[in-house]
């Protein structure tokens, strides 16, 4: 899968643009709710970081934010770093060209006040969701927030979302906001995709990151 080209679709595709707007709104609310002082942000499978970068650029808490973005694709990382420079965010952002499933990618950054897990849940199988939620517990600070997305009309999305919500509740997360929206054609002209964008608050205490074993396994390499 050419993820660099896939992300370019955000510039032309109305459905992706609308989803991005929702994600930015959820992130902005998390920043608004954050206590005074430093706001630590982690993004898992960050892409080019356009959800975080533009939100921070325009937000009143910009100076407080310290974001740690993890992305494996070097082209997307290069684009993200260039965007950081253009938005004068280099002092706020660490853009890491690393494997998001490797716990070593988050050393020194976790636990964070805001954890972004957007665009990656459709790449993991249902049986892998408990590991994803454990990763959330390791990455998120007490009273922090996790922002996540899931496409619902694809790969048993509704079933996955309900399973995720149940697992998160059992792990100490409470749902703060959920947006479920149906858009026009995404990449296929034969069906109308729908998306969930959720924010959960973590009321528990963060668990330790594993020493070396993968946080979770990505089983799919395409979104269509």
Predicted feature residues:
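Conserved SAM-binding loop of SAM-dependent methyltransferases across substrates and taxa
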Residues: 48-63
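Conserved SAM/SAH-binding beta-strand->alpha-helix loop
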Residues: 73-75
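A short SAM/SAH-binding and catalytic strip from SAM-dependent methyltransferases
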Residues: 112-128
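Conserved beta-strand signature within the Rossmann-like core of class I S-adenosyl-L-methionine
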Residues: 140-152
